[in-house]
Swiss-Prot record:
Protein name per the record: Na(+)/H(+) antiporter NhaA 1
Subcellular location: Cell inner membrane
Entry keyword Translocase: no
Molecular function per GO: sodium:proton antiporter activity
GO cellular component: plasma membrane
Keywords, alphabetical: Antiport, Cell inner membrane, Cell membrane, Ion transport, Membrane, Sodium, Sodium transport, Transmembrane, Transmembrane helix, Transport
Domain of life: Bacteria
Matches recorded under Pfam families: Na_H_antiport_1 (PF06965)
Source species: Campylobacter fetus subsp. fetus (strain 82-40)
Amino acid sequence: MNIIKNFLQKESASGILIILAMILALILANNGVLNKFYSEILRLDSGIIFGEFKLIKPTILWVNDGLMAIFFFFIGLELKYEFLEGELNSISKVALPSIAGIGGVIVPAVIFYVLNHANRFDVNGWAIPTVSDTAFALAVLFLLGSRIPISLKLFLLSLAIIDDVAAIIIIAIFYTKTLSIISLFISFCAIVILTILNYKNNQNIYIYLLCGIVLWVSVLMSGIHATLAGIIASMFIPLRDEDGDPEHGMLQSVMHFLHPIVAFLILPIFAFSNAGVVFSEDSILNLTHPVPLGIIFGLFIGKQIGVFSFAFLAIKCKLAELPNGCGWLHLYGLSILTGVGMSMSLFIDGLAYAESDAFLYANKIAILLASTMCAVTGYFVLRKASKSQN
């Protein structure tokens, strides 16, 4: 329980740090003098040259393709542990977050599609309102302190894991470009080596690190989004140590090492790099376009309806139970909080419209607006739920 408590505390602190990073990005982007400095940082090219091999990218892509690969590697480690040893290691435990998570993907996607189906390019962003930012949601929960049952926080974490699985599948299937056969072959070779290492329960972290780097570069060059390399590599990190103990295995060690790096460095840097919205007259007027509207309605309306209605049906059909100590109002308030998309929605937005900046600032404003609405509304609903319970 102490491990979970520490985890939650770090996640909430990370959410606050992400908010500060986004505020700083907004200040820089909307200041006439500092905007140029901010833009030049994001466009600055850097990379590696080794003989004929060159890997040169601007800062923004190093963040989105590199640092976010580490983020997804960490998420993959969490998924593996939770499905094998943790909160999702049985059907009864996984039922409610799984069913609620499915609703939280389907309903927002349908709302976005209904508003944008007339234009084949616009509809590419259907996945933007389907994801959640757990760090932000946990930060809101912790503002309420001990008034919120620990079971509700654990349910949010379980729901976040299901949400991450959905995001991984969506990125792999719908946001992958043309493929390079040679790079895919190198990726396959790296995966084979990782499989052998895992089968033999090899405990040398440096071999896994080397294979992971080769896998990341080859996936990046293949046309598949590089963040998937992180997920793939994480699946091969040994769960148990040489004595068969999962609590002291490499997976737990790497998770504990990466957690503060992801929470306090990678996610704030990502937020700072992607949240620099210029509040121009055009970007404000473009909020009435179906794409930004689809994002706003998908996150604020679709998420809460999808998560709550699917969870409600699952409980009424005896497929799952309400978290201990929670009432329906708790569940509804949490459902609203899942609409806080922030960093993950910004990430999917960058993939969906990578070849165009037609909705660049309007989409970011829509994500910020909808996420803020969800955070504020969810906070007051949960506050009322805690008072009603007392």
